[in-house]
Amino acid sequence: MRHFFIALVLAATLISCGNSKNNNSATESDMPAFEQKFPQKSIWVPQDQNDSTEITFSSMEEAEWKLVHNVPHHDFSDAFVQVLLSDSSSMDYPFDSLSSENFCEIFKPVVSDDGNARFIGLKPDAAHQIPHMIVQYKNSGTVRIAKEEYPYENCFYCLTPDTVYTLNTGTSTLYLVWGYAGYTGSGNSYRLMAYELDNVGLHPASVFEGTVDINGGAEDGQSLETEICTNDELYNELVETDFRDLCYFNPKESAIYIRIAASKEADECGCSTRMTNQYQKFVWNGKKFVCGK
């Protein structure tokens, strides 16, 4: 039933938004890497299965923050974030206390004692999801997306780096975060999520036309989603390109391209979607991303 619904949604999308891009690649400038967007000591290190990973941020406010995620045996219930303040004091926050039940929802911000930073993150709700942590420095207004990737007990579920795109709206800055959104039972879901930084702070932004979300995207307009089967013939090719080929942002057009998953008869594994070489285009009109040429 779910795949039938997806097929209907996709069909409606292609009818109303028939402007797809037949292009299987994009230039490096179209797809800015994490390191290119946030080069100043925004360091992430993939971890081994039983080791911890430490990420160090150096801010302009003379504060050093260390985010330590301890995830033994892929049990995220034991994961925590340890914040070391400039006076050598520390604060520990378990993931459970920092996040909502839904991986896609943003949790209530935690403000550090000195008021310099807020910690905003997303909790994984299954073993095959990647936790995210967004660190906002209030004084400087800079935002860094910290991410970690964990090897799975089955290497078939390959790791996916997040990509962060930015768009200046004139009154605020939009952060478009592309990343792995979870295993659906027959395929992997990838989602583009929108956050806005304005004079109020950093918060989820409803900037996508809900009626044109593809493949199960959120109706609230805060994300776009696409899905790929783990046994798709294009799966290995996408692994080689870090899955950036699924979505990219063209700053010259202020447009997003998301690769379309086409529905077909379910195979022996029950998977009924296959990636195509077509992209659905969403153009920024000053207020939202809408289907367009």
Q: Locations of the language-model features?
A:
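C-terminal motif of bacterial Sec signal peptides marking the signal peptidase cleavage site
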Residues: 14-16
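Short N-terminal edge-element motif at the start of the domain
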Residues: 93-169
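Beta-strand initiation motifs
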Residues: 141-145, 200-206, 276, 287-292
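Start-of-domain marker
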Residues: 22-114
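Bacterial signal peptide processing site
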Residues: 18-20
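Beta-propeller blade signature
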Residues: 133-139, 190-199, 275-286
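Sec-dependent signal peptide recognition
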Residues: 2-8
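Short aromatic loop motif centered on NTY/YTY
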Residues: 152-191, 201-281
